[in-house]
């Protein structure tokens, strides 16, 4: 009976870890054909953000330059000019196709992530007992650690999140989230988030140390500051 009680929270923890991947894989396969059909048959207007509009405009400028070049090269044969027109036409169709697939990809990934979040929220509420047990295990594990190990772990975590080399890690993480939601890469937004998140986390950490750790374990705070200095 005791083994069963211990196994249930562990199974719940494993399911929490792998459930997002399962949900994402399942719903992407299920929704892909529906989203593609909806976009191709019912969407009559194309919405472009500044990044997409700039990219599309650059591509069409390149095609326009090729057309202008065609007018300048009158000495070429009619067959060559005809092949050039066909090539430009194919490139235009390919450009529209890529833009269409990118928009479908964005809708599909965004919808999948929203569904995944809703299911995980409901799953967490239903598994409240398992979460309480896992929380008690984590608290017991941390309580049995020495203050030196706690301070070292806290210092390692803070250096990874808000240390000197953390911006590159934040850039990769935010870029991955952006890509996972299907959004177009935007250097300005990513740079703004990279420069903002570590500052916010650093402020929260200092407040937590001041309000909580100073009251619960003053020795841990002393060791942490000694290692940090």
Curated annotation (Swiss-Prot):
It catalyses: K(+)(in) + H(+)(out) = K(+)(out) + H(+)(in). GO terms for molecular function: antiporter activity; proton transmembrane transporter activity. The keyword Plastid applies. Keywords: Antiport, Chloroplast, Hydrogen ion transport, Ion transport, Membrane, Plastid, Plastid inner membrane, Potassium, Potassium transport, Transmembrane, Transmembrane helix, Transport. GO terms for cellular component: chloroplast inner membrane. One of its GO terms (biological process) is potassium ion transport. The chain crosses the membrane at residues 7-27, 107-127, 189-209. It is a multi-pass membrane protein. It is found in: Plastid, Chloroplast inner membrane. Contributes to K(+)/H(+) antiport activity by supporting proton efflux to control proton extrusion and homeostasis in chloroplasts in a light-dependent manner to modulate photosynthesis. Prevents excessive induction of non-photochemical quenching (NPQ) under continuous-light conditions. Indirectly promotes efficient inorganic carbon uptake into chloroplasts. Belongs to the CemA family. This is Potassium/proton antiporter CemA. It comes from Helianthus annuus (Common sunflower).
């Amino acid at each position: 009976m005791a083994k069963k009680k211990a196994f249930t929270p562990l199974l719940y923890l494993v399911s929490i870890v792998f459930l997002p991947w399962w949900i994402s894989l399942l719903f992407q396969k299920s929704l892909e054909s529906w989203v593609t059909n909806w976009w191709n048959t019912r969407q009559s207007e194309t919405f472009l953000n500044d990044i997409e509009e700039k990219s599309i405009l650059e591509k069409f400028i390149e095609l326009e330059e090729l057309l202008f070049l065609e007018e300048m090269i009158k000495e070429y044969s009619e067959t060559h000019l005809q092949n050039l027109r066909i090539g430009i036409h194919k490139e235009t169709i390919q450009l529209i196709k890529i833009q269409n697939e990118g928009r479908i990809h964005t809708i599909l990934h965004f919808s999948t992530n929203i569904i995944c979040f809703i299911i995980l929220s409901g799953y967490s509420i239903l598994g409240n007992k398992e979460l309480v047990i896992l929380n008690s295990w984590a608290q017991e594990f941390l309580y049995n650690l020495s203050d030196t190990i706690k301070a070292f772990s806290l210092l390692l975590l803070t250096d990874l999140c808000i240390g000197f080399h953390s911006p590159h890690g934040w850039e990769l993480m935010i870029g991955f989230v952006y890509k996972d939601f299907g959004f177009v890469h935007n250097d300005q937004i990513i740079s703004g988030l990279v420069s903002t998140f570590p500052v916010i986390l650093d402020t929260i950490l200092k407040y937590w140390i001041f309000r909580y750790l100073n009251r619960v374990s003053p020795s841990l705070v002393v060791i942490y500051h000694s290692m940090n200095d």
